[in-house]
Amino acid sequence: LTNEPTSLTDAYAFIKMRQRDGGDGPINVVVNMVAAAREGQTAFRALQKACESFLKLSPSLLGIVRRDAKVRESIRNQMSILSRYPNALAALDVEVIATKLAPRAACNFTASAAGA
C-alpha cells in the first residue's frame, strides 16, 4: 500500500478477492514510500476503515517503509537496501518489519517440523 488512491483501491480489491476466495489468517499491511510514519498511518487507516465498513474485517498494520533515495541507488546497484545501505531510513524500517515477522516464521517452522 502507498498513499496513492489507486494503491488503496488495489489493496482493497486484493483483500476483497482473498476473502471471497476463502483466504484465512491475518491480513497484515505494509505501507510503502511515504514521507513520514504519520502519512503511512493515514493511508492505512483509510484502508482499514473501508475493510471494516464493507468487508467486516480489520487488517493489521505490519509496518511503514519511508521513502528513501537510497532504495533507488540500491536497485541500480542490484543490491538489497539492507546490504548496500544498512543505516538508510528504508533499511531500518524493513528491519523493524522483519523483527515482527521473525517470531511468526519461527513458530510456523517449528509447527511444520513437528508435523502439525
Identify the role of each PLM range.
Residues 1-13, 36-40:
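Conserved Switch II/interswitch segment of TRAFAC-class P-loop GTPases
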Residues 13, 17, 70, 93-100:
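Alpha-helical scaffold segments in soluble metabolic enzymes
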Residues 16-19, 35, 52, 66, ...:
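Signal for well-folded cores of large energy- and translation-related assemblies
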Residues 17-25, 50-58:
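Arginine/glycine-rich "motif VI" loop of SF2 helicases in the C-terminal RecA-like domain
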Residues 28-31:
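Structural beta-sheet core signal
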Residues 54-80, 94:
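Beta-strand-loop-alpha "switch" segments that mediate conformational coupling across diverse proteins
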Residues 76-116:
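NTP-binding/hydrolysis catalytic cores, primarily Walker-type P-loop NTPases
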